[in-house]
Regions:
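C-terminal amphipathic helix plus adjacent low-complexity
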Residues: 330-471
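Catalytic binding pocket for nucleotide-activated donors in carbohydrate/polymer assembly enzymes
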Residues: 248-256, 286-361, 422
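Donor nucleotide-activated moiety binding/catalytic core segment of transferases
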Residues: 211, 238-289, 293-294
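Short, conserved active-site loop motifs that form the nucleotide-linked donor/cofactor pocket
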Residues: 114, 139, 259-262, 316-317
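Acidic, amphipathic alpha-helical patches
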Residues: 106, 219, 269-270, 325
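Conserved catalytic-core segment of nucleotide-activated headgroup transferases in glycan assembly
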Residues: 152-251
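Short acidic active-site motifs
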Residues: 48-51, 268-269, 324
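Active-site and donor-binding regions of nucleotide-sugar-utilizing enzymes
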Residues: 10-158, 176-179, 239-240, 288
Length: 471
């Protein structure tokens, strides 16, 4: 049995945004650390690297160590300083034949963290291909913690969400999850799409632009043909780069002027948008899995499978053109049962597809991850050697001094200052504490409802693990 932490340890979690995917991945983990392991937790913005020196944490927690260069820098610096690094994974579906795609910004292509958490058995097998033999023992299957909220969070009322959208008079809602086509109009587009069509980059980019226009036109035709239907278009959370606050063209923002369209960025959570929708759609998005967890019918606006994609299209309706999309909307209007169009065997595949992608759908993936993380607590070093890093100091001074001069309207006009808009808008992590309180409250109720709090209170992790594996 692993003993609970007797002297209060400190955990520092870094995120690049106060709300959204990465934050949702970490909050269930920090809840268990705080409530059951008596660990002090703080969240910081990723530019606040100097806080590692100032606070001297025992544990660094990250949503991933490949999706952002600063996540990798934080992990490397912390490990060299004698601080334990724990990390999850923001994306569990990757190309099994492309090491560069797997490692991302982790150019050394070596695991830095204590455990390499995988969403599924399939991801586990793929990950082993990219890790040296000595690191393969770190690779474990936990499921995707960010998907747990679709099970443990209470569903927001549709009327409340429609009120937020200022659209209470609509009886039918169609949601669309954006694909980050806006990166095509970004100065870093070649870096963004380097793993797409590597044999002919320009041809691939031209193909993507063609797909953007096709999806835009499908949405536009549906919006114009169904003025009584509300279309909620959700921008991809990772579409924008830090140095380009001016949005590039995507498949949605040319449609935002229609009265029956709401173009949403981060104002409303993705689970609330899925919940309010009668149909959930996308070009290529793992949110289709999330829609299935809410028993929502799903449509893919893309019939071309000749590019890297997950297998969720095998469990969704596919609209190949404008006419098919229109017919599906009409079918839902008339019958309220769009998925009559799907064969029963396809609907039956969804459970398998979900498990293949995100591992488990019981809301307990965060506990599977914590089963491994808590094993490492006894290995926390009593002594640390956190040196003063001049780059971290410069970033801190830029933020501290710059905040006195920051004016968004001015900075957006100055190319050299545009990157800093992202920093000043996000450094304080606005809204995080409110979201944290909601998630923590929901998790506490969920653990009690499932009878899991007894294991956690009594530190019976092996018994808990046995229960989780039976489900």
């Amino acid at each position: 049995m692993v003993r609970p932490v007797d002297l209060r340890k400190k955990l520092l979690a870094f995120v690049d945004n106060s709300l959204g995917r990465d934050t949702e991945i970490l909050l269930p983990i920090t809840f268990v650390f705080e409530k059951y392991l008596n660990v002090e937790v703080k969240f910081k913005f990723i530019w606040d690297l100097l806080y590692i020196k100032r606070w001297q944490p025992d544990i660094i927690l990250l949503p991933n160590i490949r999706g952002h260069n600063l996540y990798v820098e934080i992990a490397n610096f912390s490990r060299k300083s004698g601080i334990m690094v724990l990390a999850l994974d923001s994306e569990g579906n990757f190309n099994p034949n492309n090491a560069q795609h797997y490692w991302g910004y982790n150019y050394q292509q070596k695991s830095i963290q204590e455990w390499v958490t995988c969403w599924s058995q399939k991801a586990f097998e793929y990950a082993k291909k990219f890790h040296e033999k000595e690191d393969q023992k770190k690779i474990v299957i936990t499921g995707a913690t960010g998907f747990d909220r679709y099970i443990f969070m209470p569903k927001s009322s549709k009327s409340k969400t429609l009120t937020q959208l200022k659209a209470t008079h609509y009886q039918m809602v169609i949601g669309y999850a954006g694909w980050a086509f806006g990166k095509l109009y970004n100065s870093q587009r070649n870096h963004s799409f380097k793993n797409f069509f590597p044999e002919n980059r320009m041809k691939g980019l031209e193909w993507l632009e063609g797909q953007r226009l096709k999806v835009r036109d499908m949405l536009k035709s549906a919006i114009e043909a169904h003025p009584d239907v509300l279309f909620v278009l959700k921008k991809h959370p990772k579409e924008d780069f830090e140095d380009q606050p001016i949005e590039g063209l995507n498949e949605m923002n040319e449609l935002s002027h229609y009265s029956n369209v709401r173009y949403v960025k981060n104002e409303i959570s993705i689970e609330e948008l899925i919940n309010v929708s009668d149909i959930w759609t996308g070009f290529e998005t793992t949110t289709l899995f999330e829609a299935w967890l809410y028993n929502k019918p799903t449509i893919i606006l893309n019939n071309d499978t000749n590019f890297p994609r997950t297998e969720h299209y095998k469990g969704s309706l596919i609209a190949k053109n404008i006419e098919e999309f229109q017919a599906m909307i009409t079918k839902q209007k008339e019958t309220k049962d769009l998925e009559q169009l799907l064969e029963k065997k396809i609907l039956g595949k969804r459970k398998t597809l979900i498990e293949s992608a995100i591992g488990f759908q019981d809301g307990c993936n965060h506990l599977r991850a914590m089963y491994f993380f808590q094993k490492s607590i006894v290995n926390i070093k009593d002594s640390k050697n956190v040196s003063l890093n001049m780059r971290h100091l410069r970033l801190y001074l830029l933020m501290e001094i710059g905040r006195f001069f920051y004016k968004k309207r001015l900075f957006i006009q100055l190319p050299g200052f545009r990157k800093s808009i992202y920093v000043f808008e996000n450094r304080a992590l606005p809204g995080l504490e409110q979201r944290k309180e909601k998630v923590y409250t929901a998790l506490d109720k969920f653990h009690h409802k499932k009878g899991l709090h007894h294991f956690l209170n009594e530190n019976k992790w092996e018994s808990l693990w046995s229960v989780l594996n039976k489900n």
